[in-house]
Design a protein with these regions (language model features):
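N-terminal glycine-rich phosphate-binding loop and ensuing alpha1 helix
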Residues: 1-71, 120
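Hydrophobic packing residues within well-ordered alpha-helices of enzyme cores
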Residues: 60-64, 139, 228, 286
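Short phosphate-binding loop-to-helix
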Residues: 69-121
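Short beta-strand-to-loop acidic/aromatic patch adjacent to the donor-nucleotide binding site
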Residues: 120-130
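Conserved core of the sugar-phosphate nucleotidyltransferase
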Residues: 133-218, 222
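Conserved active-site beta-strand element of glycosyltransferases/polysaccharide synthases
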Residues: 219, 265-268, 276
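A C-terminal functional module that forms or caps the active site or interfaces directly
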Residues: 229-263
Length: 304
């Protein structure tokens, strides 16, 4: 089966304090995207699509694109590498962005930007997260049997394993019944308190550590692009479309489609642990975890 890995790498790492997508954190300077690409190809994915800003093309080719192009699938074929640009040229002609808008329009728009490049089942990930080897195998297996219309999948993680002591995080808090997602709420300020309590700072609600959350590890078929276009255009026509900061988010779109009965989402689970770099202070821990994975043979001495 042909399947694509779509990597969202155009976002600005404001909370991290720089461009965390291109920060070499592995023992030989590997960036987190390289681990995602390596794991996906091992799982069976044979195309990689990087969503970037146009001025990132040369940098992305050097940091990860060439590495991806040098990989081979299980049957010895080269991995196809493509680049999708998330910028103003991907906006509809009838829309004029508000003055001062420099921020990307969010993850739903990012995935929509790959429409002309992706014609097979695909997995979407963040560029700055480590999801684990098993997550890609699990998703690839799910995509082999996913219906062409009205169905999707996601890999869920326990909230307690996705928070940081260095500040608040944004997570898609999920409600799951019989293995399917029934609701997802993008919660923007989740804090880990000194006593281990996890709280939504906006509402004061205490969240259970075993709450399933989305880390933007999604599986879709190309039929999702029609839904993405409709949702994004509605966003642009709304008051949010005139904001310089509002974002059109993928989890929010999924939640709306669930509520309308237009999408069924299977919730998958991975045996591996997620980790990532929301803040610069997270970097040392991530680097230590990656060293352990190389030392225990999960990865070769060097990925490149």
């Amino acid at each position: 089966m042909h399947a694509s890995l779509v990597i969202m790498a155009a976002g600005i790492g404001s909370r991290y304090g720089g461009n965390k997508q291109t920060d070499g954190v592995g023992p030989h300077g590997e960036i987190l995207m390289e681990y995602g690409v390596y794991d996906a190809v091992r799982a069976g994915f044979d195309k990689v699509v990087f969503i970037i800003k146009p001025d990132m093309r040369e940098l992305m080719e050097r940091l990860c694109g060439r590495m991806a192009a040098g990989l081979r699938t299980a049957d010895g074929c080269p991995v196809e590498v493509c680049y999708a640009y998330q910028d103003s040229t991907s906006l509809p002609a009838w829309y004029t962005a508000p003055e001062g808008r420099t921020k990307p329009f969010g993850t739903a728009h990012a995935v929509l930007c790959t429409r002309e490049l992706v014609h097979e089942p695909f997995c979407v990930i963040n560029a700055d997260d480590y999801y684990g080897v098993d997550a890609y195998r699990t998703m690839y297996s799910a995509l082999r049997t996913i219906p062409a219309e009205g169905a999707a999948a996601m890999v869920g993680y326990m909230l307690r394993n996705t928070v940081t002591a260095h500040g608040t995080v944004s997570r898609g808090v999920c409600h799951v019944k019989d293995g399917c997602l029934t609701d997802i709420h993008e919660t923007l300020k989740i804090a880990l308190l000194p006593d281990g309590t996890i709280r939504d700072e906006d509402t004061g609600t205490v969240l259970a550590g075993d709450t399933v959350v989305s880390m933007n590890f999604w599986g879709f078929t190309p039929s999702i692009f029609g839904e993405l276009e409709r949702y994004f255009h509605a966003f642009l026509r709304s008051e949010a479309g005139q904001s310089v900061k509002a974002e059109c988010l993928l989890p929010t779109m999924v939640g709306d489609l669930l509520a309308q009965g237009r999408l069924t989402v299977s919730v998958l689970h991975s045996a591996d642990r997620w980790f990532g770099m929301t803040y610069h202070e997270d970097r040392a821990r991530v680097a230590q975890e990656l060293v352990k994975l190389h030392e225990t043979g999960v990865y070769p001495a060097e990925l490149r």
